Amino acid sequence: MSNSPLVNYTRISPNKNSPRNHKIDTITIHCVVGQCSVETLGNIFAPTSRQASSNYGIGFDGKIGMYVEEKDRSWCSSSASNDNRAITIEVASDTKHPYAVNEKAFAALLDMVTDICKRNGIKRLVWSTNKKDRMNHLNGCNMTVHRDYANKACPGDYLYNRHGEIAAEVNRRLGASAEKPAENKPATGEVIHTVKAGETLSKIAQKYGTTYQKIAAYNRIANANLIRVGQKIKIPADTQAAQ
């Protein structure tokens, strides 16, 4: 079992179990709640009194640190079961909701997750907004979040709402076959559109010959700018796709 060649800094934490008892098949992304460096994160995980660690961390500058080797289980997600099968990644973030990460850190995260998947034979990354799917690895889901196992905001709404986008981009890099579009026309005539990377509500509305305001109202979307990749959006039956 190898470690990532993308690592810029290593400081192994004593807070771990060696070896892990499950093969690596899951990715768990966390927010640090602080725009810190990989060195600072290493200092945080160094004391045994901390009782916490992660496999990897990404600093505000996009550098990548390793604190627990991949062969070992980190103490990161409030779940031994999850951490035994997951690679855990802490990402430098703002200290307040929605705990945003900057572009350098996000770009490094995409590189990191892609590398982990390639080396561990994860052929496709699958995200679900359904907690049951995530916790039980149903329907191919292999991405989990800290809030699944504890009363925490982690990974923050910024990263949580981008998990579908992360999966889509990593799968593109992996060359994973695209899922069949989940667009269909039920008996009611209502169309279900699955949001794809790069789409906005305005673009979707234009495709169906309607307005984004109408779609937002129909789906009770309070903020038209907050839609995510993989989200299912209902298109009113009295609209039709532009020719």
Language model segments and positions:
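N-terminal catalytic cores of peptidoglycan-degrading enzymes
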Residues: 1-83
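Basic/polar, cationic surfaces and motifs that engage anionic cell-wall
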Residues: 2-11, 16-21, 95-191, 229, ...
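Extracytoplasmic/periplasmic, Sec-exported soluble proteins
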Residues: 19-21, 48, 77, 81, ...
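Structural preference for beta-strand elements that scaffold enzyme active sites
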Residues: 26, 86-88, 142-144
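Cell-envelope and extracellular/periplasmic
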Residues: 33, 82-97, 114, 118, ...
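Structured segments of extracytoplasmic/periplasmic soluble domains
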Residues: 35, 44-47, 70, 112-123, ...
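Extracellular LysM carbohydrate-binding repeats and other cell-envelope/extracellular binding modules
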Residues: 194, 203-243
